Amino acid sequence: MHRRIEARIVDARLGSEIPLPDYATDGSAAIDLRACLDEPLALEPGQRRLIGTGLAVNIHDPGLVGVVASRSGLSLKHGLRVAQGIGVIDSDYHGEIGVILAHDGTEPYTITPGERIAQLLFQPVVQVTLDYVSAFSATTERGEGGFGHSGTL
């Protein structure tokens, strides 16, 4: 499936000094987001920083959401991840996409201007209306069993 979404450059370095966000390969599910920085930024272990990407999008369709996710290589090799697990870009948000990076590694890491820091993918959304009830209309075998209640193997 392919859709067109309007994108706006909000940092003049994007597209000149810093490559435009794009899919790395034909089979990539997500667009790489790059750090729009004036200079290298050192992250110490345990530190979090909000990093601008220079990009804004107009998803427009409430049936789509932008999802900002960690890059596996940065997480595995350096302990850098999107701080809140994922970032959600709502269809009506038009501001610059920022990435909150958390550093879980043991050594300082320096982010360079233009470095790929996260990935942006687009997913369908189903909005629901919650019907508040005192008891559910159906029961399940699991019931209210929480973590670990579905088995170990």
UniProtKB/Swiss-Prot annotation:
Substrate binds at R71, S72, G73, Q84, V88, I89, D90. It catalyses: dUTP + H2O = dUMP + diphosphate + H(+). One of its GO terms (molecular function) is magnesium ion binding. It comes from the Bacteria. The keyword RNA-binding does not apply. The keyword Hydrolase applies. Its EC number is 3.6.1.23. Disulfide bonds: none annotated. Its cofactor is Mg(2+). GO terms for biological process: dUMP biosynthetic process; dUTP catabolic process. InterPro entries: dUTPase (IPR008181), dUTPase-like (IPR029054), dUTPase-like_sf (IPR036157), dUTPase_trimeric (IPR033704). It holds the Pfam family dUTPase. It is an enzyme of class 3 (hydrolase). Keywords: Hydrolase, Magnesium, Metal-binding, Nucleotide metabolism. Pathway: Pyrimidine metabolism; dUMP biosynthesis; dUMP from dCTP (dUTP route): step 2/2. Belongs to the dUTPase family. PANTHER family: DEOXYURIDINE 5'-TRIPHOSPHATE NUCLEOTIDOHYDROLASE. This enzyme is involved in nucleotide metabolism: it produces dUMP, the immediate precursor of thymidine nucleotides and it decreases the intracellular concentration of dUTP so that uracil cannot be incorporated into DNA. NCBIfam families: dut, PRK00601.1. This is Deoxyuridine 5'-triphosphate nucleotidohydrolase. It comes from Halorhodospira halophila (strain DSM 244 / SL1).
